[in-house]
Amino acid sequence: MNNMYFSLLFLLFVLCSSCDISNPDTNSKPYPIVDIDGNGYDSVQIGNQFWLNSNFKVTHFRNGDPIPEAKTALEWIEASEQGKPAYCYYDNNPFNALLYGKLYNWYAITDPRGLAPLGWHIPTDEELIQLGNDVNNDGGSIKSNSGWQNGANGTNTSRFYALPGGFRSYNGSFSFIEYFGYWWSSSASNNENAWGRYLNSEGNYVYRYMYKKGCGFAIRCIKDS
């Protein structure tokens, strides 16, 4: 009788141990997040927001249509002048995308076909303002702790891993890799410009500025609320 009793207790223990009876966390991080090309991303919570903690690398819109790649300065300029989406690699070198992701003009990130995975979107200017507030505008806390020139590496205490991937001007030229990092918001400031953010190797501040929509910046995605 005692053997049967202890056997039943053991079985009950095993069954209970295999069940997760804790309350579900509605803000839990979905690992990994996968874009339409199969690239995987991790996320990090900063304040009440969830962010991808690496730059985007996708080459297709969410419906499967390819994002046009601008392989020459002329192609980049034409996309800018015509208000058409485009992406590129820094210096037209695919190797740079392995670390820094790809550079997109603003027309690509606001195209109605969508870039972000389902449940995610390109941040608005207001959401980037909130990110800055959440880290007290301390750029060092969102900078990666390696890769920045002039001894300007960050602490990365937020685990955002902001990297100095440089940018592409609307005129097709590339600048500032290893010295500056630039990210788009989805918010236009006027007909020609849109809001973005940059970090640099000369200080630890989150800078807000408006840029020509034809410029090529990195993008991060934020989770839908």
Question: What are these language model-derived features?
Answer:
Residues 23-225:
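Conserved positions within compact, well-structured domain cores
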Residues 15-18:
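C-terminal motif of bacterial Sec signal peptides marking the signal peptidase cleavage site
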